[in-house]
Amino acid sequence: MDLLVAHGGDPAGSNMARYLAEGMEPDGKIWHGRHFDLVIIDSPAISADWIGGEYEYDGYVFLSRHGAESGKLALTCHSTGNFAEAQFGGSDREVAIPYPGFQRRYMRRLSERREKFNGFDITIEATHHGPTGLDKPSIFVEVGTTEKQWNDKGLCGAVAELVRETAEEQDEKTPFVICVGGTHYPEKFTDVLLKGEYALGTVVPKRALVNLDDKMFSHILERNAGAAAVLVDEGGLGPEKRRILNMLEGSGLEVISA
């Protein structure tokens, strides 16, 4: 069973959580359901490395707002981790265990209902921010991109309903890949997730490749145990391309071009 987590100070997360809490059984700080439980926490979700020690579940789904300087409307879903210094939660040079099956089921459901979300980009993001220390899979589901959307109870409720449906659906155990290259909003990897045969694990963007050395990649492999391959956006590797490809080819995993 998964635990859905929202920060009480996050308007989008709180609105999604309140929608989901209807019909669930309150028990102290926890709401119990048939297929998942829910908790609203007092501290930011990006700093919730502690939550696995207090609430033991099979996986953790964080309900959150999404922000961007561009203000472009987006509904996003991403794994967490820091490839260098931890500036927004988690630990330095640590990535979380991703939740590929949940992300794939949620994003495909979101894409199928995209007519309900006119004007919104439906996209994954590269792996970023915390928490990073949980010993079970985790994923962020986010509503963006301004206070207007975060406080839109109808929008947040519609997204939360898709989260509910996803949590109630059995994981089909789709093979997943580690992704390397591309931008923060990697279109090629999103297309693979929505239309291809793979789910996605950790996504390392081009801007982080300068920090991707053998030690960091070994850690990523450990946190993505069972990955079927490494999916590479070769056009999105920048000046690190040859070094990165040589390192990936020595990993023992198949390297596939996106």
Curated annotation (Swiss-Prot):
Binds 2 Zn(2+) ions per subunit. Keywords: Hydrolase, Metal-binding, Zinc. One of its GO terms (molecular function) is zinc ion binding. Its EC number is 3.1.1.96. The keyword Ribonucleoprotein does not apply. Its cofactor is Zn(2+). It is an enzyme of class 3 (hydrolase). GO terms for biological process: D-amino acid catabolic process. Transmembrane segments: none annotated. It catalyses: a D-aminoacyl-tRNA + H2O = a tRNA + a D-alpha-amino acid + H(+); glycyl-tRNA(Ala) + H2O = tRNA(Ala) + glycine + H(+). PANTHER family: D-AMINOACYL-TRNA DEACYLASE. Belongs to the DtdA deacylase family. D-aminoacyl-tRNA deacylase with broad substrate specificity. By recycling D-aminoacyl-tRNA to D-amino acids and free tRNA molecules, this enzyme counteracts the toxicity associated with the formation of D-aminoacyl-tRNA entities in vivo. Monomer. This is D-aminoacyl-tRNA deacylase. The gene is dtdA.
